[in-house]
Amino acid sequence: MFSPSPQTLSILVAVFILATLLIRRALLPKPIPGIVYREANAKKILGNAWELLQWKKKHGEMFGYLANLAVELNEPVFQIFVHPLGKPWVIVADNREAFDILSRRTPKEFDRSRFLRSLFMPLVPEFHFHMPTGERWKAHRKLVADTMSPAFLGGVAGPQMWKSTMKLIDLWRVKERLAKGRPFSVSTDIRKAAFEIIWAATFGFDSGSTNAQTELLETLPEFTNLGDMDHEVHFPVAPDPPVFKAGLALNDAMNIGVQSLVPGLHLWLAYNLMPSLRAARSLKEAVIQDEIKKAINKFSNQTDLNWEDQGNLKRHMKSAVDIVIAREIDSARKEGRTPELMSRTVQDELFSFMLAGNEIFTLTAWTLKFLTTHQNVQKKVRDELREQCSAAVERGDAPTVSEIMSARLPYFEAMIEESTRCGSVTQTNIRTTMQEVNILGHMVPKHTEILMLNNGPGSFMPPLTVDEEKRSESSKGTAGKIGQWNVKGMRDFDPERWLVKDEEGRLTFNPNAGPRHSFGAGPRACFGRKWAALEVKIMMALIVWHFNLEPTPKPLSSFKPFPGVAHRPEMIYLRLSNV
């Protein structure tokens, strides 16, 4: 039996200790020279990751940690360490420089984030959103470009949004009657309505989710023993159609990646190994393929499409599937090639509309909470709507899509923008450096993730001091073009901060009153922002038109966010009364 000598044992122990120290050193963060960081985090293998997770556990989101760290370090550009062996992330806490990066320095110096790519690739590998800027991205975006045209939004998507929202109104009328003035949660209702609206506009038919819930509640007798007026009312839930349920499940799975240190791998394993998600993906693909086939049959022999004639398009186009398939057939005919109609590209681009439901649901949820809390704002919004849609008032009916879209509603627009701001719908914009870049005098290496805060200094905290000489030339040229918020009241919900008077003395919505990057900016801004803006406008206009959003009890009025893909409120309760 081998028995090492004391000298050998000493050598082995020394080698083990040395190896341990070398491994630990290799795992420690490697700061980018010249960029500020918290020194204590650079001495930990997990860097800032543990503190980020603890902040998220306590507050429901993690970007507040970065905003506070910016103030602590007193630096508009600093770095954090989130992945062992990974590169540091660079944080930009200056709105003007962030806007310059998004709008003028993308895509030459900055491009779509690799982190975001890892979130979307496992489910929709051919979705243009996560692709680097280039010919492939342009081709994919061109395929769906018509879905954001005024003709499609006003003539096809808008009416579908209106119809679906009215079904939500019908559901809430039943709930309001059964609740008898008591509060109830609308989180699930809003989420399903947001997705159902997108579903109807994308595929041209109703999923039936909201109708099923309304029909179930209409069969119930009047509720008894409801408790006091502040007691929450619970309602039974109708089962969702299988394909609608599948779409929601696939969307929810994105949260797996958001909360993972290796999002791409974690999501790939989930989509491919979890039986429920595998079944959901198969059902989703089968339904999309079936709808594509219907559109192919509809347009294969259609030769009179005039893309400049809006009336012509309205006659033929009933959904996003229609317009995407018709465009591909028409383009292929002109280019002398075979159309790629059943491709993964077409399927992923169509399903991507469903992924946008997170942001729409989130913005609608925050808006409802702010209007419930700020009764004076709610009254101003309703009064403006009724004044500008006076024909609907005279008819005793809801305003039509065209009336809502054409109405001059500066206060309404300001309220939506302020809800977007105060709800921090998108707390950060992320880009990847495409070359070594200079950000406020700091040299940042190629392929570094850049996080630009929407919730920090200059937005909800006093701006940090920046040496103007260190700004990029394009940033210097924008001085004074976008306003800055008064430090006093930065955190307050105040739609009037977005309003100015025009030459005729009329109140006008000023989009440049202050920083607004929630949907990004520049060539890689959110592709679906026009769709989202219209959907939220129609939903909120019809909700406020039909209901008073009465104050809710304090225990049901928390503004704490829910951790996930989008920064949404954890609870959404309404106490409704008919207008």
Regions found by a protein language model. Name each.
Residues 37-61, 67, 116-202, 220-297, ...:
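Cytochrome P450 catalytic-domain helical core, especially the substrate-recognition surface
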Residues 308-311, 372-425, 440, 445-448:
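Cytochrome P450 I-helix active-site segment
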Residues 280-363, 501-504:
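Conserved cytochrome P450 catalytic core segment spanning the I/J/K helices
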Residues 375-378, 521-525, 529-567:
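Cytochrome P450 heme-binding "Cys pocket" and the immediately downstream C-terminal segment
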Residues 194, 198, 288, 330-384, ...:
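Central I-helix of cytochrome P450 enzymes
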Residues 381, 419, 444, 493, ...:
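Hydrophobic, well-ordered secondary-structure elements that form the walls
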Residues 452-506:
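Conserved cytochrome P450 K-helix/beta-meander segment immediately N-terminal to the heme-binding cysteine loop
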Residues 2-125, 135, 139, 162-167, ...:
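N-terminal membrane-proximal hinge/A-helix region immediately C-terminal to the signal-anchor transmembrane segment
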